[in-house]
Amino acid sequence: MDGGTFDIQPIGRFYGSNTTIRRPREITCFSYDAEHKFHLGDSSLRYYYTPRLPADLNRGFDTFQKLDDTADEHLDALLETIMALEKETGKRCEADIITWRGMMTKILTAPFDNLNGFEMNATCFQVGGENNLYKIQQKQIQENQRMPPGMASQDLMAYWGYKFETLCLLQQPWDPTPRAEIESREDLVVNNNAQYCSVVRTGIGSTRLIIGGEVDAVWDCKPDRKEDPINWVELKTSAEIRNDRDMIKYERKLLKFWAQSFLLGVPKIIVGFRDNHGIVHRLEELETASIPNKVKKLGRGTWDGNICINFAAAFLEWLKSTIKEGGTWRIRKLEKSSLIQVFKIEETGTGDIISRSFLDWRSRS
């Protein structure tokens, strides 16, 4: 039988040992513009500058230019960018796994996220993840949720996050930006089509990874030398913490915040704490590397970053030994289940995971 099952439990077996981690380093990047058109390069790079507080995140909701995320993009933009880099350098980008950051976040957080499930497809050209099916399912679940009386809608709460980003970003570094531009950010139309996507080379245990993912902003400027780390900033919003229950909810959020930033090598996260009406009253700066220790020693200890990393290393090693031949494979974890199933859904081909242009390029190079 093709495939197999990996049990996350008992997680105690992932405790203690220190997995070797290769620091994520950006090897290339790409951008989507305001119409979500793909471009090589950093044209959509944005710069962080502190927003004015209090900040009303509801403002402009009626003019929100929202990305249509129903389109099936697979790995096309990521593979296009890797192909351009290989043509430029004359060297192949070697990796065991090429995927989006969102897919790896689900795997990394799985030991402490029993409630949520995921599905992704993979193929053995190099193992590659694609997240369209999962996104469609997630959207349906959100639409069917009934919000408690007095709570903002899911759409409005999603908008709050994008509004917060708009209030925190500049199109160029602070120094040459006119004061009027900085102070008029509250009036900008929010558009989440434009994105800067970093492509990094990293490693967890013996698995070499190339991961692509959106980055919100840079703290200062990108360094001239590619070897130097980049002072990326991830922007998040969260409800004010009023009691112990809120603290546990926030800690669980921190797991995702940490995993997303850890995978791309983002050193700093800025959280805007908002009330139930969508008004941000305070900011908190978090160092990504210190979050697991903070949760362990100062919080309720709801998760352990070391266990996440050790689990990811073991699971990816198992995945490589399970998916060793062509065809399309499904990687699936059901909600409230500790089992990750891997099974073949198509005997041959790559199931549209890998673009024709990339297949042609690799067969020639």
From Swiss-Prot:
Q: In terms of domain of life, where is this protein from? A: Eukaryota
Q: EC no.?
A: 3.6.1.-
Oxidoreductase among the record's keywords?
Answer: no
Which GO MF terms are attached to this record? 5'-hydroxyl dinucleotide hydrolase activity; enzyme regulator activity; GDP binding; metal ion binding; mRNA 5'-diphosphatase activity; phosphodiesterase decapping endonuclease activity; RNA binding; RNA NAD+-cap (NAD+-forming) hydrolase activity
Q: Which InterPro entries match?
A: RAI1, RAI1-like_fam
Q: Where is the signal peptide?
A: none
Locate the residues binding a divalent metal cation: 165, 216, 234-235
The principal localisation class reads: nucleus
Binding positions for substrate per the UniProt entry = 197, 214, 236, 260
Q: Required co-factor?
A: a divalent metal cation
Give me the comment on cofactor binding.
Answer: Divalent metal cation.
Reactions accelerated catalytically: a 5'-end NAD(+)-phospho-ribonucleoside in mRNA + H2O = a 5'-end phospho-ribonucleoside in mRNA + NAD(+) + H(+); a 5'-end (N(7)-methyl 5'-triphosphoguanosine)-ribonucleoside-ribonucleotide in mRNA + H2O = a (N(7)-methyl 5'-triphosphoguanosine)-nucleoside + a 5'-end phospho-ribonucleoside in mRNA + H(+); a 5'-end triphospho-ribonucleoside in mRNA + H2O = a 5'-end phospho-ribonucleoside in mRNA + diphosphate + H(+)
Its GO CC terms are: cytosol; Las1 complex; nucleus; RNA polymerase II termination complex
> Does the keyword Nuclease feature in the UniProt annotation?
yes
Q: Tell me the Gene Ontology biological-process terms attached to this UniProt entry.
A: cleavage in ITS2 between 5.8S rRNA and LSU-rRNA of tricistronic rRNA transcript (SSU-rRNA, 5.8S rRNA, LSU-rRNA); deadenylation-independent decapping of nuclear-transcribed mRNA; mRNA processing; NAD-cap decapping; nuclear polyadenylation-dependent rRNA catabolic process; nuclear-transcribed mRNA catabolic process; positive regulation of termination of RNA polymerase II transcription; termination of RNA polymerase II transcription, poly(A)-coupled
The record's subunit annotation is: Interacts with rat1; the interaction is direct, stabilizes rat1 protein structure and stimulates its exoribonuclease activity. The interaction also stimulates rai1 pyrophosphohydrolase activity, probably by recruiting it to mRNA substrates.
Q: Which PANTHER family match?
A: DECAPPING AND EXORIBONUCLEASE PROTEIN, DOM-3 RELATED
Stated family: Belongs to the DXO/Dom3Z family.
Summarizing the function annotation, the protein's role is:
Decapping enzyme for NAD-capped RNAs: specifically hydrolyzes the nicotinamide adenine dinucleotide (NAD) cap from a subset of RNAs by removing the entire NAD moiety from the 5'-end of an NAD-capped RNA. The NAD-cap is present at the 5'-end of some RNAs and snoRNAs. In contrast to the canonical 5'-end N7 methylguanosine (m7G) cap, the NAD cap promotes mRNA decay. Also acts as a non-canonical decapping enzyme that removes the entire cap structure of m7G capped or incompletely capped RNAs.
Protein name, per record: Decapping nuclease RAI1
- Provide the gene name from the record: rai1
